[in-house]
């Protein structure tokens, strides 16, 4: 009887330790699924396909949306240090096309406008010039480390040519204006938490 009880305790301890390891192992499928799916509201993220850091599907979805890390830097061996660094994005099928084209340095070919959620924000972009990964290399005054936001990827980026490009007034604005990657940034609550100095002042 005691042997059975001890065996059960060993099994439970093993399962709990394995679960805790997976939760703390940022390269694990479990961590990535939880982190990337939370880039969108749960009614989208919970049913989306999840792409892991090595490019493989780690969970097949059912709603046509795809969530994955948006950080263009190489996937670290031990995973991203936190969900903000991962820059996860949840995209509809048109926004997936946009992301793939952007990562490849090509012009997006969309059938219609696309939508992308990034509720954990990003680690910083030059608002005027695509592909700048460090603040020191950015256009003066144009670096923005975003908090939670939604993005609209237009089929025709030139339709945004006359749109506001100022990220400091709280309104939706265009990022990468007058380029093939122009898109609308729609700030939501908490957008300025990583860059307080850009928040509108009362």
Regions found by a protein language model. Give the residues of each.
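Intrinsically disordered, low-complexity Ser/Thr/Pro-rich tracts
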Residues: 5, 14, 25-28
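Bacterial N-terminal signal peptides
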Residues: 9-17
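Bacterial N-terminal signal peptides that target proteins for export
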Residues: 1-10
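Hydrophobic alpha-helical packing segments in soluble, helical-rich domains
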Residues: 2, 20-21
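Primary mode marks residue(s) on the alpha4-beta5-alpha5 output face of response regulator receiver
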Residues: 23-202
